[in-house]
Swiss-Prot record:
Belongs to the NRAMP family. Changing P35 to N/Q: Loss of function. Changing D109 to E/N: Transports manganese to a very low level. GO terms for cellular component: plasma membrane. This is Divalent metal cation transporter MntH. Residues 1-19, 72-95, 146-155, 221-238, 298-327, 371-387 are cytoplasmic. H(+)-stimulated, divalent metal cation uptake system. Involved in manganese and iron uptake. Can also transport cadmium, cobalt, zinc and to a lesser extent nickel and copper. Involved in response to reactive oxygen. HAMAP family: NRAMP. The chain crosses the membrane at residues 20-39, 52-71, 96-118, 126-145, 156-175, 197-220, 239-258, 277-297, 328-344, 351-370, 388-406.
């Protein structure tokens, strides 16, 4: 009986520690459901029904491995990816890395900020500029939580992630997808046309987010409690749960678009405004409102994460720190310029995804090199199978992004 009590007590202690260490992956997972993903998944579902759902499944599995590697680097070395690059690469290379990482973080933030502004515009009936002002105010308020430490921010962003997931459960109920066809689309690969191949590449290419790779390693570098192996074990659970939720949201986005648009003849729906306006008569005003609210939640949380990532790359690469409110103010400016110039927000969103593709290999390659170095990682070094899988993902993602880039440049 005494032994049972001891085992039960130690089991509870282990679960309590695991729960205490969870949270960083929920911040990272927000990067996988930003407005760029909304646009890509809606277009894919409207154009090809359930046929590209399998791409979301595989993209999410790849992203899980990459986020585990990023988190593991922080746990094993006590330094984030940007700091490791600073310590191991020549100074000109480090400065190049910092500049490209800042540009990519700002380009990503542009898409996320405008996405949230579009959401406010749709649900409140305000102008896009007024939506941008509301987005700016809301992100400032969320970022103020950082003063109280990482945990309050993790809870708010985790709550927004769960809200988006709940919103898409509601959307699935409204749209009533064919479950047999949905299951088939998730399991059986299908690329019926060259446009489907291009969209599949877009789904995969927009999934791996370089700024989140830098950020996740910084969120885990200061974790305390238990041994390194225990922290790593808790982190794997953290990543598995958070990324499964993000994967579900992406699947639900595409499935809802397929059920609502593709099978009702609206195969040309390609932007967020059009999706909202088309949902109203097809499903209901409530379904359209839920879509708008989920877009606001995803946009706000992902733009906050983008601001945090920008802070990490600046501190990591060049040891320079500016207050978060200054960074937030500066990174908002491109969004307001785009809106005031009257540029097409959806086109800007797509262009930002293309720019983001430049940074993927630059983040993935050093991540794999560092996590495969036994001197750096100790007992958490990558296994041979993880190394091989990692390099396959690098080659695949880089090749697809180059292809997307060329295709976009040629207007394919």
């Amino acid at each position: 009986m005494t032994n049972y009590r001891v085992e039960s007590s130690s089991g509870r202690a282990a679960r309590k520690m695991r729960l205490a260490l969870m949270g960083p992956a929920f911040i990272a997972a927000i990067g996988y459901i930003d407005p760029g993903n909304f646009a890509t998944n809606i277009q894919a579902g409207a154009s090809f029904g359930y046929q590209l759902l399998w791409v979301v499944v595989w993209a999410n599995l790849m992203a899980m491995l990459i986020q585990i590697l990023s988190a593991k680097l922080g746990i094993a070395t006590g330094k984030n990816l940007a700091e490791q690059i600073r310590d191991h690469y020549p100074r000109p290379v480090v400065w190049f890395y910092w500049v490209q990482a800042e540009i990519i973080a700002m380009a990503t933030d542009l898409a996320e900020f405008i996405g949230a502004a579009i959401g406010f515009k749709l649900i409140l009936g305000v102008s896009l500029l007024q939506g941008a002002v509301l987005t700016g105010i809301a992100t400032f308020l969320i970022l103020m939580l950082q003063r109280r430490g990482q945990k309050p921010l993790e809870k708010v962003i985790g709550g927004l992630l769960l809200f988006v997931a709940a919103a898409y459960i509601v959307e699935l109920i409204f749209s009533q997808p064919n479950l047999a066809q949905l299951g088939k689309g998730m399991v059986i690969p299908s690329l019926p046309t060259s446009e489907a191949v291009f969209l599949a590449a877009g789904v995969l290419g927009a999934t791996i987010m370089p700024h989140v790779i830098y950020l996740h390693s910084s969120l885990t570098q200061h974790l305390h409690g238990g041994s390194r192996q225990q922290r790593y074990s808790a982190t794997k659970w953290d990543v598995a749960i958070a990324m499964t939720i993000a994967g579900f949201v992406n699947l639900a986005m595409m499935a809802t678009a397929a059920a609502a648009f593709h099978f009702s003849g609206h195969t040309g729906v390609a932007d967020l405004d059009e999706a909202y306006l088309t949902l109203q008569p097809l499903l209901s005003h409530a379904a359209a409102t839920v879509f708008g609210l989920s877009l606001v939640a995803a946009g706000l949380s992902s733009t906050v994460v983008g601001t945090l990532a920008g802070q990490v790359v600046m501190q990591g690469f060049i040891r320079f720190h500016i207050p978060l409110w200054v960074r937030r103010t500066v990174t908002m400016l491109p969004s307001f310029i785009v809106i005031l110039m009257g540029l097409d927000p959806t086109r800007i969103l797509v262009m930002s995804q293309v720019l983001l593709s430049f940074g993927i290999a630059l983040a993935l390659v050093p991540l794999l090199i560092f996590t495969s170095d036994s001197k750096l990682m100790g007992d958490l070094v990558n296994s041979k199978r993880v190394k091989q899988t990692g390099w396959v993902i690098v080659v695949l993602v880089v090749a697809l992004n180059i292809w997307l880039l060329v295709g976009t440049a040629l207007g394919l």
